[in-house]
Design a protein with these regions (language model features):
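A short, structured loop/turn motif at beta-sheet edges
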Residues: 34-39, 94-99, 138-147
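Short, well-ordered beta-strand segments enriched in hydrophobic/aromatic residues
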Residues: 39-49
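Signal that preferentially marks extracellular ectodomain short beta-strand elements
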Residues: 52-54, 124-141
């Protein structure tokens, strides 16, 4: 019996480092504040691209990062009520002709001389509108407390098909954060 237990412990110890490496994006200082347009999120992400991802970007493969936000209200009689669910996609690419990295979201584009500068900008998410100023339609009210959740991930589904196949089960392509969950009391709306 002790031999069997020892075998299980060794297997568990072999798995733990893989689990630690799976969540490579850290989330710090998430905040929700009121603005003229509604409620916005500000958050800092901490991550680095591994050698394989750096090489892929430098050789022209576009990487798509997705920030996901959810806000729920607890209910005693059923599952929590999901009030808000938003996603924002960031496109990181390299242009060999200009030798610049480009970070895009929606119709906004910004160019950088180095990959580290582009990643620094990507790691600082500011003024992301998650709740429109007509918050009542979403079912949220200032002064009430809600559960907010946020994560960032590399979206391998938007990679070119050969890279999607190579990314399956490959930890080099698994760049994601755990959900950061916190309680937030919505401030009064800005005028």
């Amino acid at each position: 019996m002790p031999e069997r237990l020892r075998g299980w412990l060794l297997a568990l110890l072999a798995i733990v480092p893989a689990l630690v490496l799976a969540a490579e994006i850290e989330i710090a200082n998430p905040q929700i504040t009121a603005s003229e347009d509604g409620y916005v999120v500000a958050v800092d992400f901490s991550f680095e691209l591994n050698e394989r991802l750096e090489e892929a970007v430098t050789k022209g493969v576009v990487l798509y990062f997705v920030a996901d936000f959810e806000m729920t209200r607890p209910r005693w009689y059923w599952f929590d009520e999901k009030l808000v669910s938003r996603s924002q996609t960031y496109r990181l690419s390299y242009h060999a002709l200009t030798r610049q990295y480009r970070l895009s979201t929606g119709g906004l584009h910004q160019s950088f001389d180095s990959l580290s500068d582009a990643l620094r900008m990507l790691s600082r998410l500011r003024n992301w509108l998650v709740i429109d100023k007509d918050a009542e339609k979403a079912g949220v009210r200032p002064g009430e407390t809600y559960t907010a959740a946020l994560r960032m991930r590399l979206d391998i589904n938007q990679l070119p098909r050969p890279f999607q196949i190579a990314a399956l089960g490959n930890k080099d392509w698994n760049l994601t954060s755990d959900w950061k969950i916190w309680q937030v009391t919505l401030p009064a709306e800005a005028k």
